[in-house]
Curated annotation (Swiss-Prot):
Protein family according to the UniProt entry: Belongs to the protein kinase superfamily. Tyr protein kinase family. Fibroblast growth factor receptor subfamily.
Organism: Dugesia japonica
Name this protein carries in UniProt: Fibroblast growth factor receptor 2
Function description: Receptor for basic fibroblast growth factor.
Gene3D superfamilies noted in UniProt: Immunoglobulins (2.60.40.10), Phosphorylase Kinase, domain 1 (3.30.200.20), Transferase(Phosphotransferase) domain 1 (1.10.510.10)
Amino acid sequence: MLNKFIVIVTMLAMWNYAQDCNFELSKNETVQFTSFLPLILNCASISKFDTDLCETINDERPYNWYFQNKKIGNETKGKIKLVSSSQQMIIFNGSASDEGNYMCETINNNKEFISKTFDARMIEPSMTQMELLLNSFPNDHQEEINGRIYWLPEMILNHIRDVVIINQGAESDLHSFYYVSGSDSQISTFDVQWYFHYQPKSEDKTIIDHNIKTFYSSCNDLDLLPRKVNGSCYSSRLYLYNVEIKDQGFYSVEATLRMKNGSSHGLNFTYELKINIANILDPDKTNSILSTPQISFNLNSRVCINDRFDWICKVTPVVSYYVTIYKNNSNPNNITVLAESEVLQMNIDGNSGQGFYLKSSTVNYSVNSVQREHAGVYACRIINFKDYSSDHQNRHEPEVLMRLTVKDCVGNSYFTIIWYSISVGIIILVVISFLIIRLYNKYSNGYIVKTVIVQHPNKLYVPHDTCFPLLMPDITIKTIHKHINSSEDSLLQQKHFTNNSNIPFSQKISKYFRKSFIFSYRHVDVSSSNLDSPLGVISNTETNKLTSNSLTVETQRPQLILQNDANTKYILPSNIGWIFSRDSLIIGSKIGEGAFGIVYSALVKSFSENSASVEVAIKTLHTSFGDQDVINLIQELEMMKIIGRHRHIISLYGACIDNGHPYMVIELAKHGNLRDFLRAQRSQSKVGEIQNSGGLVTRLTVTDFLRFSIEIAEGMEYLSSRKIIHRDLAARNVLVDQYVEMKIADFGLTRIVENYYRKTTDGRLPIKWMAPECLLDRVYTVKSDVWSYGIVLWEIFTMGQTPYPTIQSDGMHQALRNGIRNEKPALASDEMYRLMLTIWNDDPLERHTFSEIIDKLTHIQLSNGGSSPKRDYLEISSNQCYSTTIV
């Protein structure tokens, strides 16, 4: 008998051992991940057994992973990484294709198969994660720039939420993770500094010099890095103990890397910390309740059956109150809240049924379809967490009551339908009336007539400084009539262009329009040959005609009018010969759009049977253009006329007006702007490839970058020799033609200067391309363009990156005063970077001229095995003084 008892006890012990010590996996999970970040799946055991009672077993179990019921094999190497004896799977650079069902499979101690499933769902990154991704660790080693700081994946994964929330009195830490590119022999120092400030981006900040630890670790020991690296990994942790309300605010961490070659790079991030002052789990650490809290609750209300009703209870001030809304089910006429009352809403951190965790001072309860059983008395009650106990329902607490009455409104539905129909009818009538008024104003009385006045200091101005000084015209717009109809418009035309036919035409224009529009009186047959001739050249015969006192107005001369979609007409003086008629243009597809307007590709049809059509670009305004847009257009046209022609400056061919809309016809650059061109080569292949007009594939090299730089410098040298400053030189404003030659464009901000130009008006400016004197004093010189050219050099050798990526535009001036400059591009030699730093000298007089820059770039090019560039662009000699007649 005793033996049987021992056997039974032994069997029970073994069964308990098997139950208590058997290996189990945790429950199935739903895992959320963010695009571009690792997806981490953990198949480890739940570790429920006691190691003092159970035999310790080395976990050498096999783990197999499946995706969508298909086993994951070696074909995913590089994309997927298995760590911790294959118990954990990391999928790098997560994307939508990684969504789905995953399963890990292993065996327990009884050699039975067990498994765990994961439902992986991709979510949008938080605003903080999107900010961090801009400087995240590059998955491709070729995108890694030496001497830069990047955020490690751990940094981004830890910021699913934009705000850090810590319970009052708790302990926590703020943690930042860095990857520093470059070997230890190249790095001089790496420093991390923490600050506290009450407002974001505030200059009033306090240095934190305690409870901080910065660690160095081997990058190749980190599981979340998808590749082997040569740099260093750091983490910095700020410890927070017993946090209080005064600790709430913004914590910024700034990392600075200084290289032995003199370059530096910085990376910063700001944490927003909020303190939960109502902590139900530890009521002793909450603030004391104010003696007279204010409760705002619904007033007595009547609602129809099936309508929606919202109960809203708000408590001020926001302190540690437990807020509830009650319904009294025992007696609707008794406004006292009883113990058996039904609690409609209590939340703790989003989990219903336990209480209210005070993240907000407001509690809401809604019923989408009210029924009769919802009628009754409701109460909003607050309880201080500090005094919270199980018998709180039996104590008198601050509360506000309201009565809800529910009624059947079906009998009133007829009047509701009538009222609804009348309201809709009134709205439709108002809309129709508004449209009729708009159409009436547009086609009857809606025109506002303005005249464009273009005044030149001299009657003749020429595109060469050896003939006459180059001066831009003064362009103004004057309203001459408001809300005239079609018949009045015809009378206006007759008044301006047919009366007093014996008066010389030049005097008429002076009388009615002062000086006028940009285009000269000449006729040009459009063909491929004359597109290469300078704009503004007219014959002596035509000049004599225009200056003759006997010139009269032709009775059939058409009036030139611009008209926008706001019913405003801009009257321009009529011209005998526009360079292009609308019929000579075949407009193609849209190739670009910006704040100025829209750019289309087009063909110019030849007037000659033997000449081919010419591909051009057409720049036009948006249909909603206004006075300033017209002025900017005329200024750019005037400036391009004065500039003339140069191999590395985009050419103006002419313009025309089509149904009141202006078209500026310019040279077509098939490869678009330089910035996008470089970025496209960077993203399409590891080594950029371009295709020239001959059909040959060419790889972009440093020699090409030097050629681009020299060509842009030659164009800027030409502008500076003519005392012209561009003011908006950037890679986005340099175009690339079919032969991959550089063409400077966008002269909307360009000005002519003797020594300097001072900007007196506000407007959008290219802050990160501007010199310090432009930012501080609004003074522009040729040396300001030299500074901008240095930024263009940096853009070229970084293949289109944005300058100063870690500095906001409003902080640029202070950064430049502190001596901060763009770091050395990975593709630039030391000699090239020294040239950039010289160009970015604070003193404009110490910066190189464009001629000196060309010489230095040519020397660098020859040192790299290139050939000296041929400067065979069109030169205008001093005896070629082309006059342009302005009426």
